[in-house]
């Protein structure tokens, strides 16, 4: 109450921010008359003038008003479009490390030209990031004439470009591209073997379109570059045949309740668990098929790989549904993005889940992959010196943007008042009743010529509605992941009189729905249209536009509430653009996922009390509030998962930054001779310490062992025992120095034989290759550690602290192994000539060619340890169990005091 009172008196933080920026808008508008008088040449010359002022020490803020005025005037001349004042406000928000929430149709693409131009003047590069290749190409080509008029270069960074094309794109003043490509290029640059192979410049300014989609929806998806691991497709096929024998149980076993099913599903957490009965049944089935030894347990260390496959198969059959979570196309399983409804070719689920789904669908099973490099979008984008974003719906996620990325959200007012009518939800008891009501609403809209956009949450639902419309003879277009090729065309005409378009979730986002249809697209379809043809198309469009406005504008019809309010708002936001008429309504049923899982008891009770009959709907603020509270719960849970994932990934990120920085230093250095010298002293010294403990008596020295080790690992054949026998005054310190000097002399001789330049090149190649190999193994070890770390909670230990401690130990181990392996390789290898270095480089390139770029959808549960699955601890080689098999009711060996089945035995 007091908060509302204070806001009324002082205005909200958003109001105060906009008020401060409004003063700069006045300054920009004051320059307009003078800039209109400038010739084209004088206007173009402004770019060089601004660059000179920046070079002389001026700040971007000091030239902002003039730069924005320049872009506005150039836009009027090139596009015949003038930036509105609200677009100037949006541009200033984007320049100040903030997120601008701008409604659909307010011209975000044109707004982005303002901060992009201003920040490009520094010469450090601007990255404008979109969600797909189509939007990246479209925005780059649309804005290219404006930027080139002002003397700036524009690059496009999309999939399929060669190294030289990529380099050219990054060297442009402004580079448009997708988040995937920028992230993958960063990883590839950090796997390069020479500075010439790198394509990116230091990360300066990123301007993200649809920022909520990229920084929030995609935040749980790490970008992964991977290489193929061993083939285990046969095992997936065999285990796939077991799952249909299992029976689902309504709820989990407890002390009071023991069911008769084999597994239970937790729909809230999106997890599946075996019951005790199910575990025994699976073990018996595996024994029958000869995949498990008689009397052996699925949970013994030797069978962890088998357990991993069983868990993956169970999840594939119970949690992942065809035409909802994925589609099968051209004998391939392709993931469908749950947030946008788009397909994601080339992206694969990790931890063997994708292979399990392939086995379930009977398509070709691709090999599992080994991670070579990975990063989350969260950690990639936090590396930019300046970061900003724009979207139509950011306010619901403002806390997360601030908490994770340090970005404030500013809601930019619309240019014209919003007149869309958002009607209350209608809730039905069954899905059939809901669909009947939807069809009736669509028919009513068509009768009055009002276009309808029907939003669905899955491909399956969109196809069901399409079948119902065919039965009712309602002409319609379907826009889902299966028909994305026609996406822009379908969306462009979705505003025509009486048209009906079914769209999966937010498919078609980024393309405006114009009332009456898109007349620009009609003109583009003609070859060299005449002025008369253009005028006729525009006149016809105006008639259609007026008809649609009179009918009530675009009607948005939601068939189900999404887990996130933001996605619902995005669907609503397709109507009412730029002050257009429009309306929206959501139709729900008690059988919808969100209602069934989160709101069912309360709302069902309410509906029963009201004595509802078949086909009758409830429309009440209480119901809407209950649904919104359910959505808030899901949003809070998803935020916690992303936050927890980031906390874990931050540990890996610190190590990644160190390794990549060291790697770049190595690559850029002319010579790493001094580094090799320092490492050599450490490595040889550490080996000597193992056989001659520091400050120890001679009786404790193991000289034969030291001689053998130096010869085996460093090709040093030294008569150490002879030295000691002949020289009484040879003590520990001087012996140490003599051994290290002997290695140095042997290495010097090698250098004289092959030449200093060849050896310097070879040192660098060995160091980089060894580091890459060890880093790859380290990533696998970190994955295994992270995915099993939640089990430490059973031993009353903090999993996060344990993860930090153990990952640091692994990293120390990596550095020590790196030093040792580099010196060992340099000691043993006989470099004959320059050709040896070239051959090594050729082999490395061959390996590179085998690497496939992969997106792996890491299940958030396994990443942060909220799942009880232990599929993560997949062994690289079979492990032999020593000691007796632990019974399920025996005390757990970890010492927690619990039964084994309730502690470390509770793996699924």
Curated annotation (Swiss-Prot):
| Keyword hit for Transferase | no
- This protein's major location comes to membrane
Q: How does it sit in the membrane?
A: Peripheral membrane protein
Specify where the region named Disordered lies, as residue ranges.
Answer: 860-908
InterPro entries in alphabetical order: Helicase_ATP-bd (IPR014001), Helicase_C-like (IPR001650), P-loop_NTPase (IPR027417), SEC_C_motif (IPR004027), SecA (IPR000185), SecA_CS (IPR020937), SecA_DEAD (IPR011115), SecA_motor_DEAD (IPR014018)
Q: Which domain of life is it from?
A: Bacteria
Reactions the enzyme catalyzes: ATP + H2O + cellular proteinSide 1 = ADP + phosphate + cellular proteinSide 2
Q: How is the cofactor bound?
A: May bind 1 zinc ion per subunit.
Going by the UniProt record, its keywords in alphabetical order are: ATP-binding, Cell inner membrane, Cell membrane, Cytoplasm, Membrane, Metal-binding, Nucleotide-binding, Protein transport, Translocase, Translocation, Transport, Zinc
Q: Which GO terms describe its biological process?
A: intracellular protein transmembrane transport; protein import; protein targeting; protein transport by the Sec complex
Which cofactor(s) does the record list? Zn(2+)
Q: Where in the cell is it found?
A: Cell inner membrane; Cytoplasm
Per UniProt, what is one GO molecular function of this protein?
protein-exporting ATPase activity
Q: Please list the disulfide bridges.
A: none
Its function, per the record, reads: Part of the Sec protein translocase complex. Interacts with the SecYEG preprotein conducting channel. Has a central role in coupling the hydrolysis of ATP to the transfer of proteins into and across the cell membrane, serving both as a receptor for the preprotein-SecB complex and as an ATP-driven molecular motor driving the stepwise translocation of polypeptide chains across the membrane.
Recorded family membership: Belongs to the SecA family.
* Name of this chain's protein: Protein translocase subunit SecA
């Amino acid at each position: 109450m007091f908060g509302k009172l204070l806001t009324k008196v002082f205005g909200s933080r958003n109001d105060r921010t906009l008020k401060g920026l409004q003063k700069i808008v006045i300054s920009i508008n004051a320059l307009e008359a003078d800039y209109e008088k400038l010739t084209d040449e004088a206007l173009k010359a402004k770019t060089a003038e601004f660059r000179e002022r920046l070079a002389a020490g001026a700040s971007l803020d000091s030239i902002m008003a003039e730069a924005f005025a320049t872009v506005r005037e150039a836009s009027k001349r090139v596009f015949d479009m003038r930036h509105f004042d609200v677009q100037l406000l949006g541009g200033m928000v984007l320049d100040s490390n903030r997120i601008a929430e701008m409604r659909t149709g307010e011209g975000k693409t044109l707004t982005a030209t303002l901060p992009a131009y201003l920040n490009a003047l520094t010469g450090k590069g601007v990255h404008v990031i979109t969600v797909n290749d189509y939007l990246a190409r479209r925005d780059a080509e649309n804005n290219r004439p404006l930027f080139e008029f002002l003397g700036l270069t524009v690059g496009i960074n999309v999939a399929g470009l060669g190294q030289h094309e990529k380099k050219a794109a990054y060297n442009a003043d402004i580079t448009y591209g997708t988040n995937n490509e920028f992230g993958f290029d960063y990883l590839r640059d950090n796997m390069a073997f020479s500075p010439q192979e790198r394509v990116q410049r230091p990360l300066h300014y990123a301007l993200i379109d649809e920022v909520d989609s990229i920084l929030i929806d995609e935040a749980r998806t790490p970008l992964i570059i991977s290489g193929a691991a061993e083939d285990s497709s046969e095992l997936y096929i065999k285990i796939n045949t077991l799952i249909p024998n299992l029976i689902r149980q309504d709820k989990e076993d407890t002390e009071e309740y023991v069911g008769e099913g084999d597994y239970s599903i937790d729909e809230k957490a999106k997890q599946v668990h075996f019951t005790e009965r199910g575990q025994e049944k699976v073990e018996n089935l595996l024994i029958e098929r000869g995949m498990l030894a008689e009397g052996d347990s699925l949970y013994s260390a030797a069978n962890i790989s088998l357990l991993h496959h069983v868990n993956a198969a169970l999840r594939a059959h119970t949690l992942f549904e065809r035409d909802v979570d994925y589609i099968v196309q051209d004998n391939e399983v392709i993931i469908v993005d749950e947030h946008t409804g788009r397909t994601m070719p080339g992206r694969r689920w990790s931890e063997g889940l994708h292979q399990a789904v392939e086995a379930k669908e009977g398509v070709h099973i691709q090999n599992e992959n080994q991670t070579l490099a990975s990063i989350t979008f969260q950690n990639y984008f936090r590396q930019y010196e300046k970061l900003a974003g724009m979207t139509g719906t950011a306010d619901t996620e403002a806390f997360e943007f601030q908490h994770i990325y340090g970005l404030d959200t500013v809601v930019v007012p619309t240019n014209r008042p919003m007149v869309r009518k958002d009607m209350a939800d209608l809730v039905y008891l069954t899905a059939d009743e809901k669909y009947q009501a939807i069809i009736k609403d669509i028919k009513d809209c068509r009768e009055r010529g009002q276009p309808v956009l029907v939003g669905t949450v899955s491909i399956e639902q969109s196809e069901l509605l399409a079948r119902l419309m065919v039965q009712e003879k309602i002409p319609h277009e379907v826009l889902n992941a299966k028909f994305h090729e026609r996406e822009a065309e379908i969306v462009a005409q979705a505003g025509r009189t009486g048209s009906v378009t079914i769209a999966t979730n937010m498919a078609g986002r980024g393309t405006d729905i114009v009332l009456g249809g898109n007349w620009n697209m009609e003109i583009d379809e003609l070859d060299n249209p005449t002025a008369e043809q253009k005028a006729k198309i525009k006149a016809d469009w105006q008639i259609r536009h007026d008809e649609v406005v009179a009918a009530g504008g675009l009607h948005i019809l939601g068939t189900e509430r999404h887990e996130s309010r933001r996605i619902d708002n995005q669907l609503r936001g397709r109507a009412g653009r730029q002050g257009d008429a429009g309306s929206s309504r959501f139709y729900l049923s008690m059988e919808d996922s969100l209602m069934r899982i989160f709101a069912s008891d309360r709302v069902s009770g309410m509906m029963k009390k009201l004595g509802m009959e078949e086909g009758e709907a409830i429309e009440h603020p209480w119901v809407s509030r209950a649904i919104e509270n359910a959505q808030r719960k899901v949003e809070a849970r998803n935020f916690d998962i992303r936050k927890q994932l980031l906390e874990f990934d931050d540990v890996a990120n610190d190590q990644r930054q160190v390794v990549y920085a060291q790697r770049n230093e190595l690559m850029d250095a002319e010579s790493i001779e001094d580094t090799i010298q320092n490492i050599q002293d450490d490595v040889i010294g550490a080996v000597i310490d193992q056989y001659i403990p520091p400050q120890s008596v001679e009786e404790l020295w193991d000289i034969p062992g030291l001689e053998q080790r130096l010869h085996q690992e460093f090709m040093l054949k030294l008569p150490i025992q002879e030295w000691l026998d002949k020289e009484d005054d040879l003590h520990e310190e001087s012996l140490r120095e003599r051994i290290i000097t002997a290695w140095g002399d042997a290495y010097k001789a090698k250098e004289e034989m092959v030449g200093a330049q060849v050896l310097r090149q070879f040192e660098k190649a060995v160091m980089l290759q060894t580091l890459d190999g060890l880093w790859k193994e380290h990533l696998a070890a970190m994955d295994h550690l992270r995915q099993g770390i939640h089990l430490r909670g059973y031993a009353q230990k903090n999993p996060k602290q344990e993860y930090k401690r153990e990952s640091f130990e692994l990293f120390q181990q990596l550095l020590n192994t790196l030093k040792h392996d580099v010196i060992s390789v340099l000691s043993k290898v006989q470099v004959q000539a320059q050709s040896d270095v070239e051959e090594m480089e050729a082999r490395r390139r061959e390996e590179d060619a085998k690497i496939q770029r992969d997106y792996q959808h890491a299940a958030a549960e396994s990443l942060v340890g909220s799942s009880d699955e232990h599929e993560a601890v997949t062994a690289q080689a079979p492990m032999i169990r020593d000691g007796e098999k632990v019974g399920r009711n025996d005390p757990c060996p970890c010492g927690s005091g619990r039964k084994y089945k309730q502690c470390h035995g509770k793996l699924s």
